[in-house]
Amino acid sequence: MENDKVVGLVKKISEERDEGAFSQIFDFIAPKINAYLIKNNLNIEQAEELTQEVLSTIWIKAKLFNPEKSKFTTWAFTIAKIKK
């Protein structure tokens, strides 16, 4: 997914609480976060639970994402690293 599209989806989440936009973000980033967590020594259950926490944080804090400072994937993985 192109960064411009992702930025637009995150903006919809932050401004409109758009569940459809969140669903697209979820489908895009959840498998990547989950794989990252498993690669970093979490078991499948722990990785799935933490992935849910990361996505929940993205939903709650979408307005804090600044596309001028980082790409969305960088921001999402930073959240995962902090929660890990």
Where are these regions (language model features)?
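N-terminal module of bacterial RNA polymerase sigma factors
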Residues: 1-31
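Structural recognition of an alpha-helix C-terminal capping motif at a helix-to-coil junction
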Residues: 49-56, 60, 70-82
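Phosphate-coordinating loops and pocket residues in cytosolic domains that bind phosphorylated ligands
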Residues: 27, 52, 67
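Sigma70-family region 2
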Residues: 14-15, 42, 55-69
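Hydrophobic recognition helices of helix-based DNA-binding modules
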Residues: 33, 37-40, 58, 62, ...
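Short, charged helix-capping/linker segments at alpha-helix termini
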Residues: 14-24, 34-53
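Hydrophobic alpha-helical core bundles mediating ligand binding, dimerization, or RNAP-core interactions
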Residues: 22, 26-33, 55, 77, ...
